[in-house]
Swiss-Prot record:
Protein name: UPF0316 protein Exig_2248
A Pfam family hit: DUF2179
NCBIfam families: PRK04164.1-5
Keywords: Cell membrane, Membrane, Transmembrane, Transmembrane helix
Gene source species: Exiguobacterium sibiricum (strain DSM 17290 / CCUG 55495 / CIP 109462 / JCM 13490 / 255-15)
Bilayer topology term: Multi-pass membrane protein
């Protein structure tokens, strides 16, 4: 029974570490990804060694179950850490002057554009936001422009702009 619980525990650690390693690699944090990859491999070898030492159906099922539960935990951890930035586009039918001001008052940089849509003139706001602040931005948009169409893109790399100036001031 102790080995079964150990297999489960190792999987519940292994998969979230795997998730974080993948995220760090995608975000360009290769040193952290390398360290996490080493830890991940050690846990993987230990857990698999226990399963192969005593090939029982229960051990294999617990290994697979631990992997599935680990994915849930890894996803939860990733959402809580919210590493990185998103480029958010807010599309509106009317010029959102009040929303633009409120977004800026809340410390976000915003650039607005006018374009031609199928049914007439449309407006687009581009806002770069730390993922940890996405909920704040979403709530502002919902409050001031409830009919707005919102799209978020993962921003892996960027240079200059209002956000970096703001980050340098706050450090």
């Amino acid at each position: 029974m102790g080995q079964i619980l150990l297999i489960l525990l190792l999987q519940l650690i292994y998969v979230p570490v795997l998730t974080l390693r993948t995220i760090m690699l995608v975000k360009g944090r290769t040193i952290i990804a390398g360290v996490l990859g080493t830890v991940e491999t050690l846990i993987y070898i230990f857990a698999l060694g226990i399963v192969f030492r005593d090939l029982t159906t229960v051990g294999m099922i617990v290994y697979a179950l631990g992997f599935g539960l680990g994915i849930l935990i890894g996803g939860f951890v990733e959402r809580k850490l919210a590493i990185g930035y998103n480029m958010i586009q807010v599309h509106t039918q009317d010029f959102p002057a009040e929303l633009i001001q409120v977004i800026r008052d809340n410390g976000f940089g915003v650039t607005h554009y006018q374009g031609q849509g199928r049914d007439g003139i449309r407006y687009r706001l581009d806002v770069l936001a730390a993922r940890t602040r996405m909920k704040v931005l979403r709530n502002l948009v919902e409050e001031y422009e409830p009919k707005a169409f919102l799209v978020a893109f993962d921003s892996v790399d960027f240079k200059g702009g209002y956000m970096l100036k703001g980050l340098k001031r706050s450090q």
